[in-house]
Amino acid sequence: PRFFGRSAIAQEYGAWDIEILAEINNAPRLTHDDIRREAERYRASGADVIDIGCTPGLAFPGLGDVVRELVDVGMRVSVDTFDVDEIRTAVRAGASVVLSVNRSNLDIANELSASEVRWVAVPDLGGPIETLEPTIAKLDEWGVSYLIDPILEPIGMGFMASLERYANARRRWPDAEMLMGIGNL
């Protein structure tokens, strides 16, 4: 509008809010100092939650220490793994969000339901959005806090279909909080 000599119209964004979750990928391959530096950099850049990305099949014996160190300096921490032992360790050390839960590891959410942790519910591996329904039903039954992540696919590898999944998830669960992992883009 300024180009045409007019003032800009104030944009109304609504009542929605977001949290920025920044993932430290392949954390088991990094030193504790590297993880801490990366977490500090992400927090300084505006991240609300620091996500410790575990590596499938690679043990992470220092996971509890890493989570505890970050929580002790005031960071909110999440853990990105399906491994129930890693989830248990991270939550006991103070992680407040777990990525991810589906029918393959759902029992751990019940086991840890007394904690304040929020779970990120995802479809079963390779499954359609309908596979979220039994997971969400159980989380609701157990009174567990969760977000829904229909999974965003990379451009050229199912991106448009994944956007349609997000729209479908919003229609199915209009009041649910959602997570959109844009790192795949």
Task: Annotate each PLM feature.
Residues P1, I50-A59, G74-D83, I87, ...:
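Catalytic beta/alpha-barrel core
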Residues R37, A44-S45, D72, R92, ...:
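Residues at the C-terminal ends
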